[in-house]
Amino acid sequence: MPKMKTNRGAAKRFKKTGSGRFKCKHNHLRHILTKKSSKRKRKLGPKFMVSAADHKRVVACLPYA
């Protein structure tokens, strides 16, 4: 049986934690930042954990993570 392929787009966006969950970066923090409030930009700063609803799809994209 051939090897399963890793989705390279997902590999660049998600990192697996020690507990087996995945973390990734918020969006909307690259450009056009002047109209966004400091509070909004601060909330978008830290990484966040992928929800349980999306976890199965991320695992399918990253079979060797």
Swiss-Prot record:
Belongs to the bacterial ribosomal protein bL35 family. InterPro entries: Ribosomal_bL35 (IPR001706), Ribosomal_bL35-like (IPR021137), Ribosomal_bL35_CS (IPR018265), Ribosomal_bL35_sf (IPR037229). SUPFAM superfamilies: L35p-like. GO terms for molecular function: structural constituent of ribosome. Gene3D superfamilies: 4.10.410.60. This is Large ribosomal subunit protein bL35. GO terms for biological process: translation. PANTHER family: 54S RIBOSOMAL PROTEIN BL35M (PTHR33343), LARGE RIBOSOMAL SUBUNIT PROTEIN BL35M (PTHR33343:SF1). Keywords: Ribonucleoprotein, Ribosomal protein. One of its GO terms (cellular component) is cytosolic large ribosomal subunit. The keyword Ribosomal protein applies.
